[in-house]
């Protein structure tokens, strides 16, 4: 089975993924004499002519890991300087991610090439935790992801299997110094007013000479 649409070039194929600078004049666009599984040199950028070596020796049948996760017709790019485009794995930005696998040499139509690399092809260097691990007495609703993934390598759907509380968000009632209804004030109020000095209820005139 041959791949009718793909690009190739000449370069050493030692590692799984190699960047090469190849002049456009030496690129043979989309020949039909190479079968699936052969080494391809796919462009990562049409500006600097950097090509990616795809040494993924896979069968002609496109495996699950080589299928685009999501195809958006409005989010396309064209490579090889022609009207033919290819699904090229994009490297994950950031030091904590590596490509999990490369796509086979089978070519995919332009309608199935996302503009940005999808995180399903990326795996963290340190595996995510498979369960929630509370730190202290935390309520379940207070869990948050331990770290954020790079914006250039975001998953299609939110991942919830690798969460860890970044801080304890305990929903405990805080004391507002509320006075209980059974407490009395320090200075109880009297039901009536009492003068500081005694006032006689009757007045007696002083003696005066008549």
Swiss-Prot record:
GO cellular component: cytosol; keratin filament
Superkingdom classification of source: Eukaryota
Distribution of this protein across tissues and organs: Localized high up in the well differentiated portion of the hair follicle cuticle (about 10-15 cell layers above the apex of the dermal papilla).
Role of this protein: In the hair cortex, hair keratin intermediate filaments are embedded in an interfilamentous matrix, consisting of hair keratin-associated proteins (KRTAP), which are essential for the formation of a rigid and resistant hair shaft through their extensive disulfide bond cross-linking with abundant cysteine residues of hair keratins. The matrix proteins include the high-sulfur and high-glycine-tyrosine keratins.
Name of the protein in its database record: Keratin-associated protein 26-1
Assembly description: Interacts with hair keratins.
Alphabetically ordered keywords of this record: Keratin, Repeat
Alphabetized InterPro entries for the sequence: Keratin_matx (IPR007659), KRTAP_PMG (IPR007951)
Gene Ontology MF terms: structural molecule activity
Matches recorded under PANTHER family: KERATIN ASSOCIATED PROTEIN 3-3-RELATED, KERATIN-ASSOCIATED PROTEIN 26-1
Pfam families on file: PMG (PF05287)
Species of origin: Homo sapiens (Human)
Family label: Belongs to the PMG family.
